[in-house]
Amino acid sequence: MNDHELYMRRAIALAANVPDLPFGALIVDGDSGTILSEGWNKTSVNPTWHGEIDAINGLASSGVLVEGKNLVLYTTAEPCPMCQAAALWSGIKMVVFGTSIRSLQRSGWRQIDILAEEVVRCSPAWNCKLIGGVLERDCDALFQKAMFHRVSSSDLISLVSSGGSVE
């Protein structure tokens, strides 16, 4: 197992905090390997509080000096445009993700159709390397299971609220 897989396994574990929205993220000092911050989806509190934003906010409030650090963001899914832009503004030099936006879309997840690669390309003032597909099958399985559960739960709620029976 390489370092990217090790940290992605941690992101997958963090995603378990919200199994219906399994977006887990962590920020690592790429030189020392120290985990600086962790996060997961908290959109039930704030619609912009994605896993990546949670990790970035945690790092910002930690008091850790990040200027000049080789920051790496690990996340179970390719960052949406908001999260990728936040990573750039935060000085993150590398983003490593599992599931792609395209894969999420194929599984039924609503996504803004702008890839992280395009956000980076349109932001020449920053350098940020993207590495996708790390433990992709494991991450894809997380999102497929969550989507199945979300669809099954909403069907059940609709059935019960319309007077149907679950017997």
Regions found by a protein language model. Give the residues of each.
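Zinc-dependent deaminase
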Residues: M1-V18, A86-E167
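Short beta-strand scaffold segments in enzyme catalytic cores
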Residues: F23-G33
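Short beta->alpha transition motifs characteristic of CBS
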Residues: T34-T43
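A short, polar/charged loop-to-alpha-helix boundary motif
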Residues: T43-G58
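Short helix-terminating capping/connector loops at secondary-structure junctions
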Residues: D20, L65-K69, S123-P124
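Glycine-rich phosphate-binding loop at the start of an alpha helix
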Residues: E5, W49, I53, A77, ...
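Conserved hydrophobic/aromatic pocket- or pore-lining residues that grip, position, or stack substrates
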Residues: A11, G24, A55
